[in-house]
From Swiss-Prot:
Assembly and interaction partners: Part of the 50S ribosomal subunit.
Protein name: Large ribosomal subunit protein uL6
Keyword hit for RNA-binding: yes
Keyword Ribonucleoprotein attached: yes
Organism: Wolinella succinogenes (strain ATCC 29543 / DSM 1740 / CCUG 13145 / JCM 31913 / LMG 7466 / NCTC 11488 / FDC 602W) (Vibrio succinogenes)
Length: 178
């Protein structure tokens, strides 16, 4: 049984949560996020806490219970504090720059790689570190993965785009015969 679903989500000041049928609407200022549960879990707000109740006793309902609780918690954290991912660029001549709403990457190709920055996401570049900030955890992770995919780190010299906390397992190069 899910132990994650049992935990109530405390709603911080500044973030407002309302239940509209099977939807939970979270708002903070002009930002609004909606989580649709499709009636799979019971919803209740009491004492500044959001409580999700088990929808049924089958295994599927128990899985949904923990999943929707985690998704709702990510929305609350995203609206109150936000999420950040950092990428590092390693390689001679590899650069990144933000030009308007486009991230321009020079990754050793014959052409620059342009990545359109979606609304609600901030991307900052400082030397060889790309910082991605936003309120949607899934979107931030997806953007970081898409940028990394342009030039994943290679195992011989470590050149490419990698997550800042990622370790690259290096391989030894060819050895000469004597």
């Amino acid at each position: 049984m899910s132990r994650i679903g049992k935990r109530p989500i405390s709603i911080p000041s500044g973030v407002d949560a309302k239940i509209e049928g099977s939807k939970i609407v979270f708002t903070k200022g002009k930002q609004e996020k909606v989580l649709e549960t499709y009636g799979r879990v019971g919803l209740e707000i009491a004492n500044g806490e959001l409580v999700l109740k088990l929808g049924g006793e089958d295994a599927q309902s128990k899985a949904y219970w923990g999943t929707y609780r985690a998704l709702a918690n990510n929305i609350v954290i995203g609206l109150s504090a936000g999420f950040t991912k950092q990428l590092e660029i390693n390689g001679v001549g590899y650069k990144a720059a933000v030009k308007g709403s486009v991230l321009e990457l020079a990754l050793g190709f014959s052409h620059p790689v342009n990545y359109e920055i979606p609304e609600g996401v901030e991307i900052a570049v400082e030397k060889n570190v790309i910082t991605i900030k936003g309120s949607d955890k899934q979107q931030i992770g997806q953007i970081a993965a898409e940028i990394r995919e342009f030039r994943p780190p290679e195992p011989y010299k470590g050149k490419g785009v990698k997550y800042s906390d990622e370790t690259i397992i290096r391989k030894a190069g060819k050895t000469s015969k004597k």
